[in-house]
Swiss-Prot record:
It comes from the Bacteria. It is found in: Cytoplasm. It is an enzyme of class 2 (transferase). It comes from Stenotrophomonas maltophilia (strain R551-3). This is Ribosomal RNA small subunit methyltransferase H. Specifically methylates the N4 position of cytidine in position 1402 (C1402) of 16S rRNA. Belongs to the methyltransferase superfamily. RsmH family.
Length: 322
Protein backbone atom coordinates (compact mmCIF):
# COMPACT_ATOMS: atom_id res chain seq x y z
CA UNK A 1 0.00 0.00 0.00
CA UNK A 2 1.29 3.47 -0.90
CA UNK A 3 2.14 5.77 2.03
CA UNK A 4 -0.33 8.40 0.84
CA UNK A 5 -3.16 5.88 1.06
CA UNK A 6 -1.97 4.81 4.50
CA UNK A 7 -2.31 8.42 5.61
CA UNK A 8 -6.05 8.14 4.99
CA UNK A 9 -6.53 10.55 2.10
CA UNK A 10 -6.37 10.62 -1.67
CA UNK A 11 -2.75 10.40 -2.86
CA UNK A 12 -1.78 13.83 -4.12
CA UNK A 13 -0.43 12.24 -7.29
CA UNK A 14 -3.94 11.01 -8.04
CA UNK A 15 -5.75 14.27 -7.31
CA UNK A 16 -7.95 15.39 -10.21
CA UNK A 17 -6.82 17.92 -12.81
CA UNK A 18 -3.14 17.81 -11.81
CA UNK A 19 -1.03 19.71 -14.34
CA UNK A 20 2.50 18.41 -14.70
CA UNK A 21 5.04 21.22 -14.25
CA UNK A 22 7.95 21.89 -16.57
CA UNK A 23 10.76 19.34 -16.74
CA UNK A 24 8.85 17.09 -14.34
CA UNK A 25 10.62 13.82 -15.16
CA UNK A 26 14.03 15.47 -15.42
CA UNK A 27 13.63 17.10 -12.00
CA UNK A 28 12.77 13.80 -10.31
CA UNK A 29 15.69 12.09 -12.02
CA UNK A 30 17.97 14.95 -11.00
CA UNK A 31 16.90 14.89 -7.35
CA UNK A 32 17.34 11.10 -7.25
CA UNK A 33 14.75 10.76 -4.49
CA UNK A 34 15.43 8.18 -1.77
CA UNK A 35 12.52 6.71 0.20
CA UNK A 36 13.50 8.00 3.64
CA UNK A 37 15.07 11.26 2.45
CA UNK A 38 14.29 14.87 3.39
CA UNK A 39 13.51 17.19 0.48
CA UNK A 40 12.71 20.88 0.11
CA UNK A 41 10.59 22.38 -2.65
CA UNK A 42 11.38 26.07 -2.24
CA UNK A 43 8.86 27.21 -4.86
CA UNK A 44 5.73 25.15 -4.26
CA UNK A 45 3.52 26.95 -6.78
CA UNK A 46 0.65 24.53 -7.28
CA UNK A 47 2.58 21.50 -6.10
CA UNK A 48 3.38 19.73 -9.35
CA UNK A 49 6.97 18.84 -8.52
CA UNK A 50 6.08 18.25 -4.86
CA UNK A 51 3.53 15.63 -5.87
CA UNK A 52 6.20 13.83 -7.85
CA UNK A 53 8.60 13.79 -4.91
CA UNK A 54 5.89 12.45 -2.60
CA UNK A 55 5.16 9.53 -4.92
CA UNK A 56 8.77 8.40 -4.42
CA UNK A 57 8.99 8.96 -0.66
CA UNK A 58 8.28 6.20 1.84
CA UNK A 59 6.47 6.60 5.19
CA UNK A 60 9.66 7.89 6.86
CA UNK A 61 10.46 10.40 4.12
CA UNK A 62 9.84 14.12 4.57
CA UNK A 63 8.90 16.90 2.17
CA UNK A 64 9.27 20.54 3.18
CA UNK A 65 7.47 23.04 0.96
CA UNK A 66 7.90 26.80 0.84
CA UNK A 67 6.38 29.67 -1.11
CA UNK A 68 6.00 33.37 -0.46
CA UNK A 69 2.72 33.50 -2.38
CA UNK A 70 -0.21 33.11 0.05
CA UNK A 71 -2.35 31.55 -2.69
CA UNK A 72 0.25 28.83 -3.19
CA UNK A 73 0.39 28.20 0.55
CA UNK A 74 -3.41 27.91 0.62
CA UNK A 75 -3.18 25.16 -2.00
CA UNK A 76 -0.45 23.43 -0.01
CA UNK A 77 -2.53 23.56 3.17
CA UNK A 78 -5.57 22.21 1.36
CA UNK A 79 -3.94 19.43 -0.65
CA UNK A 80 -0.78 18.50 1.27
CA UNK A 81 -1.24 19.31 4.96
CA UNK A 82 -3.14 16.04 5.71
CA UNK A 83 -0.02 14.07 4.72
CA UNK A 84 2.14 13.63 7.86
CA UNK A 85 5.27 13.61 5.71
CA UNK A 86 4.71 17.22 4.64
CA UNK A 87 5.67 20.46 6.41
CA UNK A 88 4.67 23.89 5.05
CA UNK A 89 6.30 27.31 5.45
CA UNK A 90 5.28 30.65 3.97
CA UNK A 91 8.31 32.60 2.90
CA UNK A 92 11.03 33.00 0.28
CA UNK A 93 13.58 30.23 -0.18
CA UNK A 94 16.12 32.88 0.75
CA UNK A 95 14.79 32.43 4.30
CA UNK A 96 15.15 28.65 4.44
CA UNK A 97 17.84 28.81 7.14
CA UNK A 98 15.24 30.46 9.39
CA UNK A 99 12.99 27.41 9.14
CA UNK A 100 13.86 25.01 11.94
CA UNK A 101 12.62 22.05 9.90
CA UNK A 102 15.61 22.43 7.56
CA UNK A 103 18.17 22.19 10.37
CA UNK A 104 18.34 18.39 10.20
CA UNK A 105 19.77 18.62 6.70
CA UNK A 106 18.31 17.95 3.28
CA UNK A 107 18.82 15.24 0.68
CA UNK A 108 17.53 17.43 -2.11
CA UNK A 109 16.49 21.02 -2.82
CA UNK A 110 14.44 22.31 -5.75
CA UNK A 111 13.92 25.91 -6.85
CA UNK A 112 11.60 26.50 -9.83
CA UNK A 113 12.32 30.16 -10.47
CA UNK A 114 10.30 33.03 -11.85
CA UNK A 115 6.58 33.62 -12.06
CA UNK A 116 4.19 30.67 -11.97
CA UNK A 117 1.46 29.94 -14.50
CA UNK A 118 -1.34 30.69 -11.99
CA UNK A 119 0.24 34.06 -11.23
CA UNK A 120 0.39 34.89 -14.94
CA UNK A 121 -3.09 33.61 -15.69
CA UNK A 122 -4.91 35.55 -12.95
CA UNK A 123 -5.25 39.15 -14.12
CA UNK A 124 -5.76 40.44 -10.58
CA UNK A 125 -2.17 39.50 -9.65
CA UNK A 126 -0.89 42.12 -12.08
CA UNK A 127 1.90 40.10 -13.71
CA UNK A 128 0.61 39.87 -17.28
CA UNK A 129 0.67 42.50 -19.99
CA UNK A 130 -1.82 40.36 -21.91
CA UNK A 131 -4.57 40.57 -19.29
CA UNK A 132 -5.59 43.87 -17.77
CA UNK A 133 -5.44 43.98 -14.00
CA UNK A 134 -4.06 46.00 -11.08
CA UNK A 135 -0.39 46.85 -11.66
CA UNK A 136 0.91 44.85 -8.70
CA UNK A 137 3.41 42.07 -9.62
CA UNK A 138 4.19 41.12 -6.02
CA UNK A 139 4.56 37.40 -5.40
CA UNK A 140 3.77 38.20 -1.77
CA UNK A 141 1.02 40.83 -1.97
CA UNK A 142 1.41 41.54 1.75
CA UNK A 143 5.05 42.62 1.47
CA UNK A 144 6.77 45.59 -0.12
CA UNK A 145 5.48 48.10 -2.62
CA UNK A 146 3.56 47.19 -5.74
CA UNK A 147 4.78 47.82 -9.26
CA UNK A 148 2.38 50.76 -9.53
CA UNK A 149 3.66 52.33 -6.31
CA UNK A 150 7.25 51.96 -7.45
CA UNK A 151 6.76 53.15 -11.02
CA UNK A 152 4.78 56.20 -9.87
CA UNK A 153 7.47 57.16 -7.33
CA UNK A 154 10.98 56.77 -8.71
CA UNK A 155 12.96 58.92 -11.15
CA UNK A 156 13.32 58.01 -14.80
CA UNK A 157 16.98 57.11 -14.28
CA UNK A 158 16.09 54.38 -11.79
CA UNK A 159 13.36 53.02 -14.06
CA UNK A 160 15.80 52.92 -16.98
CA UNK A 161 18.45 51.17 -14.89
CA UNK A 162 15.97 48.48 -13.82
CA UNK A 163 14.70 47.91 -17.37
CA UNK A 164 18.24 47.58 -18.67
CA UNK A 165 19.70 45.52 -15.83
CA UNK A 166 16.87 43.03 -15.37
CA UNK A 167 15.23 43.09 -18.79
CA UNK A 168 18.17 43.87 -21.07
CA UNK A 169 15.79 46.36 -22.70
CA UNK A 170 17.67 48.46 -25.27
CA UNK A 171 14.99 51.15 -25.24
CA UNK A 172 15.10 51.50 -21.46
CA UNK A 173 15.73 55.26 -21.42
CA UNK A 174 13.04 56.02 -23.97
CA UNK A 175 10.51 53.91 -22.06
CA UNK A 176 11.49 55.47 -18.72
CA UNK A 177 11.06 59.01 -20.03
CA UNK A 178 7.65 58.11 -21.46
CA UNK A 179 6.56 56.57 -18.16
CA UNK A 180 7.47 59.69 -16.19
CA UNK A 181 5.77 61.98 -18.72
CA UNK A 182 2.59 59.89 -18.67
CA UNK A 183 2.35 59.60 -14.87
CA UNK A 184 2.52 63.39 -14.48
CA UNK A 185 -0.87 63.49 -16.19
CA UNK A 186 -2.27 60.35 -14.56
CA UNK A 187 -0.53 57.82 -12.29
CA UNK A 188 -0.35 54.22 -13.48
CA UNK A 189 -2.71 51.74 -11.86
CA UNK A 190 -3.39 49.04 -14.48
CA UNK A 191 -1.20 46.61 -16.40
CA UNK A 192 -2.85 47.53 -19.70
CA UNK A 193 -1.95 51.20 -19.21
CA UNK A 194 1.73 50.39 -18.85
CA UNK A 195 1.78 47.79 -21.64
CA UNK A 196 0.06 50.16 -24.08
CA UNK A 197 2.43 53.01 -23.25
CA UNK A 198 5.50 50.83 -23.78
CA UNK A 199 4.15 49.52 -27.08
CA UNK A 200 3.45 53.08 -28.24
CA UNK A 201 7.05 54.26 -27.81
CA UNK A 202 8.88 51.15 -29.01
CA UNK A 203 10.24 51.24 -32.56
CA UNK A 204 8.74 48.65 -34.85
CA UNK A 205 11.04 45.72 -35.43
CA UNK A 206 11.16 42.07 -36.36
CA UNK A 207 10.93 40.92 -32.75
CA UNK A 208 7.99 38.54 -32.36
CA UNK A 209 7.56 39.06 -28.62
CA UNK A 210 5.25 41.69 -27.17
CA UNK A 211 7.00 45.08 -26.84
CA UNK A 212 6.36 45.09 -23.07
CA UNK A 213 7.81 41.63 -22.40
CA UNK A 214 11.27 42.70 -21.25
CA UNK A 215 10.01 45.68 -19.26
CA UNK A 216 7.42 43.65 -17.36
CA UNK A 217 10.05 41.00 -16.61
CA UNK A 218 12.47 43.62 -15.33
CA UNK A 219 9.94 45.36 -13.10
CA UNK A 220 8.76 42.04 -11.67
CA UNK A 221 12.31 40.92 -10.88
CA UNK A 222 13.04 44.24 -9.18
CA UNK A 223 9.82 44.38 -7.16
CA UNK A 224 10.32 40.84 -5.84
CA UNK A 225 14.12 41.04 -5.36
CA UNK A 226 14.31 37.81 -7.34
CA UNK A 227 18.01 37.75 -8.16
CA UNK A 228 19.10 38.77 -4.66
CA UNK A 229 16.83 36.07 -3.23
CA UNK A 230 18.28 33.55 -5.68
CA UNK A 231 21.85 34.24 -4.57
CA UNK A 232 20.89 34.00 -0.89
CA UNK A 233 18.82 30.89 -1.54
CA UNK A 234 21.66 29.09 -3.31
CA UNK A 235 23.99 29.70 -0.37
CA UNK A 236 21.35 28.53 2.11
CA UNK A 237 20.51 25.43 0.08
CA UNK A 238 24.12 24.29 -0.16
CA UNK A 239 24.58 24.88 3.56
CA UNK A 240 21.59 22.68 4.38
CA UNK A 241 22.33 19.92 1.86
CA UNK A 242 23.71 16.71 3.29
CA UNK A 243 26.78 15.19 1.61
CA UNK A 244 25.46 13.46 -1.49
CA UNK A 245 22.37 15.70 -1.55
CA UNK A 246 21.18 17.14 -4.85
CA UNK A 247 20.44 20.75 -5.81
CA UNK A 248 18.09 21.23 -8.79
CA UNK A 249 17.34 24.70 -10.16
CA UNK A 250 14.98 25.57 -13.02
CA UNK A 251 15.48 29.02 -14.55
CA UNK A 252 13.54 30.77 -17.28
CA UNK A 253 15.77 33.58 -18.51
CA UNK A 254 19.45 34.22 -19.05
CA UNK A 255 19.97 36.37 -15.94
CA UNK A 256 18.78 33.59 -13.62
CA UNK A 257 20.58 30.85 -15.50
CA UNK A 258 23.84 32.80 -15.54
CA UNK A 259 23.73 33.18 -11.75
CA UNK A 260 22.96 29.48 -11.25
CA UNK A 261 25.61 28.30 -13.72
CA UNK A 262 28.32 30.54 -12.32
CA UNK A 263 27.44 29.64 -8.75
CA UNK A 264 27.60 25.89 -9.38
CA UNK A 265 30.81 26.20 -11.39
CA UNK A 266 32.43 28.30 -8.67
CA UNK A 267 31.81 25.57 -6.09
CA UNK A 268 32.69 22.71 -8.44
CA UNK A 269 35.71 23.89 -10.41
CA UNK A 270 39.04 25.39 -9.36
CA UNK A 271 39.54 28.94 -10.64
CA UNK A 272 42.18 29.33 -13.38
CA UNK A 273 45.69 29.97 -12.10
CA UNK A 274 47.04 33.52 -12.29
CA UNK A 275 50.84 33.81 -12.32
CA UNK A 276 50.71 37.45 -11.20
CA UNK A 277 48.92 36.63 -7.96
CA UNK A 278 50.30 34.84 -4.90
CA UNK A 279 49.68 31.09 -4.88
CA UNK A 280 46.13 30.52 -3.71
CA UNK A 281 45.03 28.02 -1.13
CA UNK A 282 44.24 24.54 -2.39
CA UNK A 283 40.76 24.57 -3.90
CA UNK A 284 38.37 22.10 -2.29
CA UNK A 285 35.22 21.65 -4.38
CA UNK A 286 31.87 21.66 -2.60
CA UNK A 287 29.71 20.49 -5.50
CA UNK A 288 29.90 18.05 -8.38
CA UNK A 289 28.03 19.05 -11.52
CA UNK A 290 25.48 16.48 -12.70
CA UNK A 291 25.41 16.90 -16.47
CA UNK A 292 24.91 20.23 -18.17
CA UNK A 293 21.93 22.39 -19.02
CA UNK A 294 18.77 20.29 -19.37
CA UNK A 295 15.92 21.55 -21.55
CA UNK A 296 12.42 20.40 -22.38
CA UNK A 297 11.91 17.73 -25.02
CA UNK A 298 10.02 18.43 -28.23
CA UNK A 299 7.15 16.39 -26.83
CA UNK A 300 6.91 18.57 -23.73
CA UNK A 301 7.17 21.76 -25.75
CA UNK A 302 4.25 20.66 -27.91
CA UNK A 303 2.15 20.15 -24.78
CA UNK A 304 3.44 23.18 -22.85
CA UNK A 305 4.94 26.04 -24.92
CA UNK A 306 5.86 27.91 -21.71
CA UNK A 307 8.59 25.32 -21.16
CA UNK A 308 10.58 26.59 -24.15
CA UNK A 309 12.84 28.82 -22.07
CA UNK A 310 13.18 26.49 -19.06
CA UNK A 311 16.70 25.33 -18.16
CA UNK A 312 17.42 22.81 -15.40
CA UNK A 313 20.83 22.52 -13.75
CA UNK A 314 21.68 19.90 -11.15
CA UNK A 315 24.61 19.59 -8.75
CA UNK A 316 25.47 17.22 -5.92
CA UNK A 317 27.12 18.15 -2.65
CA UNK A 318 30.41 16.35 -2.18
CA UNK A 319 30.99 13.79 0.50
CA UNK A 320 33.09 15.11 3.37
CA UNK A 321 36.05 12.87 2.51
CA UNK A 322 35.77 13.30 -1.27
Amino acid sequence: MRPEAQAGHLPVSQSPAVHLPVLYTQVLEGLRVIENGRYLDGTFGRGGHARGVLTQLGPEGRLLVMDKDPEAIAVAERDFAPDPRVSIFRGSFAQLLQWDATAEGLDGVLFDLGVSSPQLDVAERGFSFGKDGPLDMRMDPDSGESAAQWINRVEDREIADVLWTYGEERQSRRIARAIVARREKQPFSRTAELAELIASVMPRGKDKIHPATRSFQAIRIHINRELADLEAGLDAAVERLKPGGRLAIISFHSLEDRIVKQYMNRLAKAPPANRRLPEAEVFVPTLDLIGGAIKATDEELAANPRARSAVLRVAQKREADA
